């Protein structure tokens, strides 16, 4: 039988690939060996209890997502005044009809004239 009074040492690597010595300690209550850095996590329950079903988890998640969506809608409604200046007026969106007025169509200005100068001649 193993001597559980002395900790078992092992090599461990962290995220920076540094090797250090860790130790395993015996937990008399659970009859398992746990790493010493996990001390205090015995009460942590990451797995849902058996009374929680997947449908209740789904409904809880759906409810939370709807609540977040409602909050975002409210925030969006309050913040729309910031974006009204970005919307052009209707008169700005109408293209000028040069052919009907008899005027010559205007040349389009290039965004980068130096790059497009060899094409426009």
Curated annotation (Swiss-Prot):
GO CC terms of this entry? virion component
Q: Where does the record place Basic residues bias?
A: 104-121
Q: Domain of life of the organism in this record?
A: Viruses
Compartment annotation = Virion
Q: Name one GO molecular function term.
A: DNA binding
Tell me yes or no: is Acetylation among this UniProt entry's keywords: yes
Q: Does the keyword Acetylation apply?
A: yes
Q: Which residues carry this modification: N-acetylalanine?
A: 2
Question: Which Gene Ontology terms describe the biological processes this protein takes part in?
Answer: symbiont-mediated suppression of host cytoplasmic pattern recognition receptor signaling pathway via inhibition of IRF3 activity
Disordered: annotated segments: 1-24, 84-121
Q: Report keywords, A-Z.
A: Acetylation, DNA-binding, Host-virus interaction, Inhibition of host innate immune response by virus, Inhibition of host IRF3 by virus, Inhibition of host RLR pathway by virus, Late protein, Viral immunoevasion, Viral release from host cell, Virion
Q: How is it modified after translation?
A: Acetylated.
UniProt induction comment: Expressed in the late phase of the viral replicative cycle.
User: What does the UniProt record say this protein does?
Assistant: Structural protein required for transport of intracellular particles from the assembly sites to the plasma membrane. Binds to both ssDNA and dsDNA. Suppressed the activation of the cGAS/STING pathway by interfering with the recruitment of IRF3 to TBK1, which in turn suppresses IRF3 phosphorylation, decreasing interferon production.
Q: How does it assemble?
A: Interacts with the major capsid protein. Interacts with host IRF3; this interaction interferes with the recruitment of IRF3 to TBK1.
Family assignment from sequence similarity: Belongs to the asfivirus structural protein p14.5 family.
List the protein's name.
Structural protein p14.5
**Source species of the chain:** African swine fever virus (isolate Tick/South Africa/Pretoriuskop Pr4/1996) (ASFV)
């Amino acid at each position: 039988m193993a001597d559980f009074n002395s900790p078992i040492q092992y090599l461990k690597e962290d995220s920076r690939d540094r090797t250090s010595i860790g130790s395993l300690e015996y937990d008399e209550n659970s009859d398992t060996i746990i790493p010493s850095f996990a001390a205090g996590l015995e009460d942590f329950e990451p797995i849902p209890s058996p009374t929680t079903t997947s449908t209740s988890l789904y409904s809880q998640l759906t409810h939370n997502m709807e609540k977040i969506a409602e909050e975002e809608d409210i925030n969006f409604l309050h913040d729309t005044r910031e974006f009204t200046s970005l919307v052009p007026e209707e008169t700005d969106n109408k293209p000028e009809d040069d052919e009907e007025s008899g005027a010559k169509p205007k040349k389009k200005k290039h965004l980068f004239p130096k790059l497009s100068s060899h094409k426009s001649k």
